């Protein structure tokens, strides 16, 4: 029979009832719909571990970065400080799974066995039994990743090199995510905590490896990660920071929180790949060039894109998808061909035009309906320069990418032209329309 580590802080650090917990996680993760869509996702995260009412929003900001990781990340290596039981080294549990109100997460026993020859890795179920630093991360991970296996290590006294050695052995590829759980300074007055934490945030971003436990309670695992980041020249990006005085606590004695992400591959690099896919698809048909294969797990997930062709800076074709219904690489290739050869506004692209053409690929977030009471309310909610809009009414639909704001910066004029594009009368009541918005990540290439 499988042995399970039961949830120890459900109902205290986070809701113990599954539906309430799922709703709270969804609220945190959906708190910032202004974030652009993501192609890349982090190799590692640094997240806080207080009760959700205190640090949940800061933790969620890190987990939002995993939007593109679902179905790719299959293993999470989770390290945090051992608060309850003294540990020499890094303590692995002997159980088969960790349980939360959202279900159980199986441990990667093979990965844990791969550490058996390292003297700094020990077995200790007591170190995990009541430990909250790892447990509070699991509901977020279960929500954003779905199925994954877990390598949990409660870290006690250990050197930087000892922690880094464990992380390097477990590093893996895109299937492996590293998560370090740590808070910042503890129990200073608000202003003093902000001063201390500001210095600590700068040191983390600079990949310092000599943080102490007055700066971060999880300094030991964090120093190990930062040593790996320094060795691999991976930048450390600050996502969010605050303290308990900013959330649910008083200001006399506060605890600091932060979240960071470490990316091995940037969105810019992923964008270069999408541009290359679009160009290769067009050149295969236009110039008879050999087909090019692009293999990467993230290209296999569903994605929605628009491909735009510009000739000497003027529109030459633009076709896209508003919903993610096919693999990302296929979506880009098909939309590139449609923009070049099937946009009804333009003749088919000719080979002689190709040298004057620039290719843009826009990667879309999932459209979200805007709930509004009247035109004034709608205008207040629209983010000029950022939102792409979809307008639907009377069986007609049209969209403008955010790029259109460059030529039509006025919100009323933008909506008026969108009505015209949909074939609707200029005096159509906006209250009778369904309007959704999305964000894009736009990439340019010759």
Identify the function of each model-found stretch.
Residues 17, 41-45, 75, 256, ...:
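A generic secondary-structure signal marking the coil-to-beta-strand transition
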Residues 246-266, 438-446:
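Short, basic/aromatic-enriched C-terminal tail that caps enzymatic domains
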Residues 266-446:
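Basic nucleic-acid-binding interfaces
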Residues 2-248, 261, 271, 289:
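Active-site histidine-anchored catalytic micro-motif
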Residues 244-253, 349, 426-428:
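Short proline/glycine-enriched turn/loop segments at secondary-structure junctions
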């Amino acid at each position: 029979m499988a042995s399970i580590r039961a949830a120890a802080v459900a109902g205290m650090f986070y809701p113990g009832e599954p539906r309430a917990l799922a709703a709270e996680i969804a609220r945190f993760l959906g708190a910032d719909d202004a974030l652009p869509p993501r192609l890349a996702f982090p190799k590692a995260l640094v997240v806080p571990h207080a009760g959700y009412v205190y640090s949940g929003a800061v933790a969620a900001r890190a987990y939002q970065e995993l939007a593109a990781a679902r179905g790719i990340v299959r293993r999470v290596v989770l390290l945090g400080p051992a608060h309850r039981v003294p540990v020499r080294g890094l303590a692995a549990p002997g159980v088969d799974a960790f349980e939360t109100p959202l279900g159980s997460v199986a441990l990667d026993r093979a990965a844990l066995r791969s550490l058996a020859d390292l003297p700094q890795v020990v077995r200790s179920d007591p170190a995990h039994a009541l430990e909250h630093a790892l447990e509070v991360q699991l509901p977020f991970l279960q929500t954003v990743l779905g199925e994954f296996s877990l390598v949990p290590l409660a870290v006690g006294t250990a050197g930087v090199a000892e922690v880094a050695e464990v992380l390097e052995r477990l590093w893996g590829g895109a299937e492996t995510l590293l998560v370090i759980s740590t808070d910042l300074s503890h129990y200073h007055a608000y202003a003093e905590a902000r001063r201390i934490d500001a210095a600590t945030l700068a040191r983390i971003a600079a990949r310092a490896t000599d943080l102490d436990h007055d700066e971060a309670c999880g300094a030991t695992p964090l120093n190990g990660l930062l040593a790996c980041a320094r060795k691999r020249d991976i930048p450390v990006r600050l996502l969010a920071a605050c303290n308990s005085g900013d959330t649910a606590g008083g200001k006399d004695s506060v605890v600091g929180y932060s979240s960071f992400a470490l990316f091995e591959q940037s969105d810019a690099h992923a964008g270069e790949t999408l541009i290359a896919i679009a160009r290769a698809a067009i050149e295969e048909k236009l110039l008879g060039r050999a087909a090019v294969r692009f293999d990467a797990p993230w290209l296999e997930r569903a994605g929605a894109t628009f491909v735009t062709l510009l000739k000497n800076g003027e529109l030459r074709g633009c076709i896209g998808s508003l919903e993610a219904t096919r693999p990302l690489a296929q979506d880009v290739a098909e939309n590139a061909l449609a923009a070049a050869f099937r946009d009804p506004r333009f003749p088919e692209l000719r080979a002689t035009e190709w040298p004057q053409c620039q290719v843009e690929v826009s990667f879309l977030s999932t459209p979200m309906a805007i709930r509004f009471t009247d035109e004034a309310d709608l205008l207040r909610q629209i983010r000029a320069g950022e939102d792409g809009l979809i307008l639907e009414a009377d069986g007609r639909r049209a969209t403008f990418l955010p790029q259109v704001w460059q030529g039509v910066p006025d919100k009323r004029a933008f909506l008026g032209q969108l009505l015209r594009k949909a074939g609707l009368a200029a005096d159509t009541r906006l209250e009778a329309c369904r309007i959704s918005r999305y964000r894009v990540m736009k990439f340019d290439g010759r």
